[in-house]
């Protein structure tokens, strides 16, 4: 009996430690296909390695929020960190600037990563 209580206690302590860990999100912004001005494409913002799972993601065009973006299901990795993909259709031009803005408890202010069409 004492052994099973000890095991349960250790499991609960381990779970509490996992839940207390905070990890800052890694952000990657890229297009599905090589960009061509005037040709429809998809803009992706892949956010990974974050914990806890509460997060806000916005895609931006020239600093303004793009409405009605799509989001994948929130998933987790082997290390219990989370990842998610935000994406939308877009048509790149020479002058438009696209970015992804992420708000998370580990960030003092929202982090914005600009799409680099040459990457």
Swiss-Prot record:
The keyword Transmembrane does not apply. InterPro entries: B2Microglobulin, Ig-like_dom, Ig-like_dom_sf, Ig-like_fold, Ig/MHC_CS, Ig_C1-set, MHC/Immunoglobulin. Gene3D superfamilies: Immunoglobulins. Its main location: secreted. CDD domains: IgC1_beta2m. SMART domains: IGc1. Component of the class I major histocompatibility complex (MHC). Involved in the presentation of peptide antigens to the immune system. Coiled coil: none annotated. This is Beta-2-microglobulin. One of its GO terms (cellular component) is MHC class I protein complex. GO terms for molecular function: identical protein binding; MHC class II protein complex binding; peptide antigen binding; protein homodimerization activity; structural molecule activity. Residues 1-20 form the signal peptide. It comes from Rattus norvegicus. Belongs to the beta-2-microglobulin family. GO terms for biological process: amyloid fibril formation; antigen processing and presentation of endogenous peptide antigen via MHC class I; antigen processing and presentation of exogenous peptide antigen via MHC class II; antigen processing and presentation of exogenous protein antigen via MHC class Ib, TAP-dependent; cellular response to iron ion; cellular response to iron(III) ion; cellular response to nicotine; intracellular iron ion homeostasis. Keywords: Disulfide bond, Immunity, Immunoglobulin domain, MHC I, Secreted, Signal. Disulfide bonds join 45-100.
């Amino acid at each position: 009996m004492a052994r099973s209580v000890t095991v349960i206690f250790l499991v609960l302590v381990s779970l509490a430690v996992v839940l207390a860990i905070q990890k800052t999100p890694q952000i990657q912004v890229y297009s599905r296909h090589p960009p061509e001005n005037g040709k429809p494409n998809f803009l992706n913002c892949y956010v990974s390695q974050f914990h806890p799972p509460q997060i806000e993601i916005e895609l931006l065009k020239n600093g303004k929020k793009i409405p009605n973006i799509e989001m994948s299901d929130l998933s987790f990795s082997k290390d219990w960190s989370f990842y998610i993909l935000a994406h939308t259709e877009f048509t790149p031009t020479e002058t438009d600037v696209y970015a992804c803005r992420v708000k998370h408890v580990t960030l003092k202010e929202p982090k914005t990563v600009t799409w680099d069409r040459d990457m």
